[in-house]
């Protein structure tokens, strides 16, 4: 077993930790075997050296080991739409809104997320504002996914070992490897994923990590405007992982018939603003908010395996808004979470 001193010396010298070594270090952190100063040293050492695909994959593997898992019966179209956040754009909750459409399409959405860190409203904040109960057991979250095709996994409920890391991250106040681990540690083990990232360099990196972790079909995306979603203001960088192969390309929303807009057109300063935007989209009100949600929901429908192409996924997303089926999913989630939390 590698000690934290040995690991830190390796990192200071600019050398990568081997996969098994990173497993050891991460387990020590998650068991509470390291002091806050030792944890901080490792995190900063990794950040300065720049985390490798192997190190990130090992860290995610251990976080999955320590997570409270969510049992899901039907896994064929199981998908997550969790992103890294941290893009600083303060848009409304695009991926959360998209989740209702994806569930209405027949996928099983295991939505993983938490409260706001860098944005005005995290997925948990807006869902709570909508009346969704977050304090559910892992078994009851699984029931939500099985019964209505959508369940929300509130990250602090499933990653309790993070209690050793959270104070250190807060005091450091800089990005660490944990800023990119959240979307890699879905407690339901979703093998299909639409993941937005806050930096262009992470597009290829996270796709390779997902491949190493055994993902089946995933799209890792970063808008050229900095958005950690598929953007409407211009091209989006994409790394698509499918059946072990990774293809990197740019996606232009104009090719799918969408008009361009700016991030300001999608702004939501508070959770209440985000709630209003989300409801407007689910009520099929036309405009940039509806367009960007259809674009991202279409991608999630595609990676979930419900459709064979992104274009088909987008068309289905638009139909589900028009029919009101996506709006019904919100009502179903509120009703079921209240019943299970009682």
From Swiss-Prot:
Its cofactor is Mg(2+). Homodimer. Pathway: Amino-acid biosynthesis; L-tryptophan biosynthesis; L-tryptophan from chorismate: step 2/5. Its EC number is 2.4.2.18. This is Anthranilate phosphoribosyltransferase. Anthranilate 1 binds at residue 83. Keywords: Amino-acid biosynthesis, Aromatic amino acid biosynthesis, Glycosyltransferase, Magnesium, Metal-binding, Transferase, Tryptophan biosynthesis. Coiled coil: none annotated.
């Amino acid at each position: 077993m590698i000690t934290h001193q040995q690991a830190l010396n390796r990192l200071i010298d600019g050398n990568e930790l081997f996969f098994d070594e990173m497993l050891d270090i991460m387990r020590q952190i998650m068991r509470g075997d390291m002091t806050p100063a030792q944890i901080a040293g490792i995190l900063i050492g990794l950040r300065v050296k720049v985390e490798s695909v192997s190190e990130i994959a090992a860290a995610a593997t251990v976080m999955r080991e320590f997570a409270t898992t969510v049992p899901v019966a039907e896994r064929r179209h199981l998908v997550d739409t969790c992103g890294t956040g941290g893009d600083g754009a303060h848009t409304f909750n695009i991926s959360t809104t998209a989740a209702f459409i994806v569930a209405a399409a027949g996928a099983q959405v295991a939505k993983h997320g938490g409260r706001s860190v860098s944005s005005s409203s995290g997925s948990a904040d807006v869902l709570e504002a909508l009346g969704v109960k977050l304090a559910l057991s892992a078994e009851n979250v699984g029931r939500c996914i099985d019964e209505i095709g959508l369940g929300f996994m509130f990250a602090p409920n499933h990653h309790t070992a993070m209690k050793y890391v959270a104070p250190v991250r807060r005091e450091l106040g800089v990005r660490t490897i944990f800023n990119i681990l959240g979307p890699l540690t879905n407690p339901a083990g979703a093998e299909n994923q639409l993941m937005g990232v806050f930096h262009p360099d992470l597009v290829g990196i996270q796709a390779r990590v997902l491949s190493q972790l055994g993902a089946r079909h995933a799209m890792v995306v970063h808008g050229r405007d900095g958005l950690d979603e598929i953007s409407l203001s211009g091209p989006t960088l994409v790394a698509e992982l499918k059946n072990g192969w990774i293809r990197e390309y740019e996606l232009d929303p104009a090719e799918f018939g969408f008009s361009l807009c700016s991030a300001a057109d999608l702004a939501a300063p508070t959770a209440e603003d985000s709630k209003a935007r989300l409801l407007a989209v689910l009520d099929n009100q036309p405009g940039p908010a509806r367009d960007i949600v259809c674009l991202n929901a279409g991608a999630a429908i595609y990676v979930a395996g419900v459709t064979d192409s992104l274009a088909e996924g987008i068309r289905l997303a638009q139909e589900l808004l028009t029919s009101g089926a996506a709006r019904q999913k919100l009502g179903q989630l509120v009703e079921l979470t209240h019943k299970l939390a009682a």
